[in-house]
Regions:
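Short alpha-helical interface patches
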Residues: 44, 50-77, 237-244, 313-316, ...
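Conserved ATP-driven motor cores of ASCE-family P-loop NTPases powering translocation/secretion/packaging/pilus
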Residues: 379-485
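Glycine-centered flexibility motif
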Residues: 84, 193, 227, 395, ...
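Basic- and hydrophobic-enriched, low-structure N-terminal and domain-boundary segments
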Residues: 1-107, 111-114, 159-162, 168, ...
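P-loop NTPase motor domains
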Residues: 82, 90-96, 100-389, 403, ...
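Short, surface-exposed polybasic-aromatic patches that bind anionic ligands, especially phosphate groups
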Residues: 497
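Short, flexible active-site loops
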Residues: 2-7, 325-326, 361-363, 414
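Short intrinsically disordered, low-complexity coil segments enriched in acidic
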Residues: 2-7, 429-432, 520
């Protein structure tokens, strides 16, 4: 049409006849208008075609974060905790809130999450260390490179590592002897008893559990107030509960005590009355209390490690300290209460120290510690005190079994970073699929007509599709992970073994269980300031 218009314009200029010139000019104008309309129609069709092929987002706009977006969001700042890599960029999180990692056993949590952060983070750190691998690989580095004091609680003497001690009852004497805080002693003892005899979700038999806790509270108050620090220990508590003669002698001592305004004597009177009027219930209380401290019997593995203290958990806040709790993997299920008792005390001690100096708790085998009394409630307060908890579990079902559904949901809501990989449980895969959200996709329908010679017709529609289906999550490659970070789009990131990062690969000592780690050419490099002795 535009060519015709040009020809008409040339003809109108070159033809001398006025009528012909007028006709050619009019024809050219008509051609221009027609051409413009045709071009506009073509553009309109193209616009509609693109609109038909572009999802509207009406069902959702979920998508994964890109590497550039991660950099703009501050997730590549090495001042934070290490998470993985995305499009060649190492990912870190500098927030103050907590983290949780969910992955099955032998899936690489240690090599791609725990060890990297023990080699990277210079904050004081408390580490649960099944097998002693974490201390074996990272303790020397944290002592020599970061200049930290290293404590290894290692009752079983694994791998020739140090065998430091911590007495969980010693601080009760400190409270009793300090008149300014003595009134808090009964609350401390009650919290200890609740940790030793936790309250499960199933509230049946609560009467007997409370009876056992009352017995523990009474004896611990007596231990704290009688002025014999060397015998204020869990093995001594076991001796009293286990031996009827010692129990009688202890009750006589308590009855004559004026400590705490007569509270200790009142406990003795109450216990004696229960023993006289309801001996069967009293025997149940004794059995429950004895069972709670049975792992601390004087002939057991833990006895020496809890008889005295070589350090204070408060040092985690006031200095630069790394504390490793080493336990054989086959003892986690039977002696996990030791981990739980010390972990609760460590968190409490650090939270009570002034200031907000950062302290990291790396809690592997978290569900096997037993229930940490009050943890789900205190998680909301700890970030403001500089305390960050990284919980590591094999499945969310483990958490629900120990803490119940409501408390588990609270723990998850307080985890600013949620890390998942090697997912095989369908329930977890479904939960993750829902959490990732939905996106809008275009669907194409083809109508072949009723007759063989009918032209096929096409129609487009929109539908909702999960960003990843449960099956796609379960079939993710081994080296990939899903990161859910509060206020950010989800990230499908790479897991990064510590030996692929310089200088981590040089800092890590050989694994005392599996030997030397691989030494490929590093994929990533970080730069650290030299340690200063000031």
């Amino acid at each position: 049409m535009f060519a015709l218009a040009a020809a008409c314009a040339w003809g109108a200029w070159s033809v001398p006849n006025d009528a012909a010139q007028w006709f050619l000019a009019a024809s050219g104008a008509v051609a221009v208008i027609a051409g413009t309309d045709r071009r506009r129609a073509e553009q309109d069709r193209e616009r509609k075609r693109r609109a038909a092929e572009t999802p509207s987002g009406v069902y959702g706009t979920a998508s994964f974060m890109t590497g550039e977006e991660a950099a703009r969001a501050g997730l590549t700042n090495p001042a934070g905790l290490f998470l993985g890599a995305l499009e060649g960029r190492m990912l870190f999180h500098t927030g103050k809130a907590h983290c949780i990692s969910v992955a099955p056993a032998r899936s690489g949590k240690g090599t791609s999450a725990v060890i990297p952060n023990l080699l990277h983070s210079q904050a004081s750190t408390y580490i649960i260390d099944p097998k002693g691998e974490l201390a074996g690989v990272t303790a020397r580095h944290r002592r020599e490179t970061f200049g930290q004091k290293v404590i290894v609680l290692n009752p079983w003497g694994l791998h020739g590592l140090p065998k430091h001690r911590f007495n969980p009852l010693a601080y009760l004497i400190d409270i009793y002897e300090d008149e300014t805080i003595r009134r808090g002693l009964t609350e401390e003892v009650a919290a200890l008893a609740l940790q030793l005899v936790p309250e499960p979700e199933d509230a049946r038999n609560k009467f007997f559990r409370e009876g056992s806790r009352k017995l523990l509270r009474a004896i611990m108050l007596h231990f704290a107030s009688r002025g014999r620090p060397a015998s204020c220990t869990l093995p001594d508590l076991w001796r009293v509960l286990q031996n009827a003669t010692r129990m009688d002698e202890t009750l006589i001592e308590m009855a004559g005590s004026d400590a705490l305004g007569g509270v200790v004597a009142d406990f003795a009177d109450d216990i004696a009355r229960t023993l006289e009027k309801n001996p069967e219930s009293f025997q149940s209380f004794i059995e429950g209390a004895t069972q709670a401290v049975s792992i601390f019997d004087p002939a057991g593995w833990l006895a020496d490690s809890v008889m005295a203290s070589d350090f204070s958990f408060g040092e985690l806040k006031t200095g630069k300290v790394s504390v490793y709790l080493v336990i054989p993997p086959d003892r986690v299920a039977t002696h996990g209460a030791w981990l739980g008792l010390l972990t609760r005390q460590a968190i409490t001690a650090v939270a009570r120290q002034p200031g907000n100096t950062p302290v990291l708790f790396m809690l592997d085998e978290f569900a096997n510690m037993g229930k940490l009394a009050g943890l789900s409630e205190s998680l909301t307060l700890l970030p403001g005190l500089g305390v960050r908890v990284w919980i590591i579990v094999q499945s969310l079902d483990q958490l629900r079994t120990v803490y119940g559904r409501e408390a588990t949901n609270t723990i998850l809501s307080q985890a600013e970073v949620q890390q998942f990989f090697a997912v095989q449980d369908h329930g977890l895969a479904k939960m993750l699929s829902d959490a990732l959200g939905q996106r809008t996709v275009k669907t194409l329908s083809v109508n072949l007509g009723r007759k063989e010679d009918d032209d096929p017709g096409e129609s487009r529609a929109e539908a909702a599709r999960p960003l990843m289906s449960p099956d796609e999550i379960r079939l993710m490659p081994t080296g990939q992970q899903i990161l859910l970070i509060q206020s950010h789009r989800p990230i499908r990131a790479q897991r990064v073994p510590f030996w692929t990062v310089a200088p981590w690969c040089d800092w890590a000592a050989p694994n005392p269980v599996e030997g030397a780690h691989p030494r490929p050419e590093p994929t990533y490099r970080l730069t650290y300031r030299e340690k200063r002795d000031d």
